[in-house]
Amino acid sequence: MSFLSKNGAGILACLLISILSWYLGGFFPVVGAPVFAIFIGMLLHPFLSSYKQLDAGLTFSSKKLLQYAVVLLGFGLNISQVFAVGQSSLPVILSTISIALIIAYLFQRFFALDTKLATLVGVGSSICGGSAIAATAPVIDAKEKEVAQAISVIFFFNVLAALIFPTLGTWLHLSNEGFALFAGTAVNDTSSVTAAASAWDSLYQSNTLESATIVKLTRTLAIIPITLFLSYWQSRQQENKQSLQLKKVFPLFILYFILASLLTTLLTSLGVSSSFFTPLKELSKFLIVMAMSAIGLKTNLVAMVKSSGKSILLGAICWIAIILTTLGMQTLIGIF
């Protein structure tokens, strides 16, 4: 059986949903195409789940296309930007990432939340929302239901942050620099960071958008050490501390992601415009949308809602802790 005859129907279903989701995401950037894709897929699940000819293509899209998307995501990351954000913001970034991951670990231990779901919510909250979840899910062998739950939780707090952060920043009397750091570290998804920073700029005729975006992209670089650690940890669990294979400890798609980041950094330093990588970054985003479509089509919405109470609570705790941490660190280093 050829690849197309085996996978074509499922891939086509994901493609059609993704085109619609991409279009809707353009009109509602705070929500974003990946979230639309998951929810459209889940709404269609009861009607399409009986069509078994879709299964192979959905599995390919939710697994392989997601890995390809992560590799291409590397072309949007310039490692030299870590140094561009300056010494003042790196302590805030590292503190917020650390506190969210620690909370996720403790929460799953004390409240009996599924380890993989807690991990996805933790990395999504602390690093870069859907992109971090997309990179982490294949590494820890997360189920489609767990990915959908984590994305949904992150989406809720993204939208909430985009709506209330400009007002909260005004109430707290944050400076322009302080709000850029606040939005860049306490909002997960790039589109929501953009929405919050743009709203602030409209209020105060400032230029925080670029600074907030750089902080956000610097957070994204944490995907590299976090996924490598989780891959090693997952391999130890599966192998029961026996001899490990390098391919299992360091998945090839993560290594390719790192190489793509290094290549981007090198070429940019040699004078290549960042716009050169734009088509690859856009393709990465679209493949993530296709993967989310597949995950949605394989997820039972009713069952997910019934079991999502603890994950929402974890997302709320992580979100509040990140807000308090970034404000506290800004106070300590004299920005706030």
Swiss-Prot record:
It comes from the Bacteria. InterPro entries: UPF0324_pro. One of its GO terms (cellular component) is plasma membrane. It is found in: Cell membrane. The chain crosses the membrane at residues 65-84, 91-113, 118-140, 153-175, 211-233, 249-271, 286-305, 312-334. Its main location: membrane. Keywords: Cell membrane, Membrane, Transmembrane, Transmembrane helix. It is a multi-pass membrane protein. Belongs to the UPF0324 family. PANTHER family: INNER MEMBRANE PROTEIN YEIH-RELATED, UPF0324 MEMBRANE PROTEIN FN0533. This is UPF0324 membrane protein SP_0034.
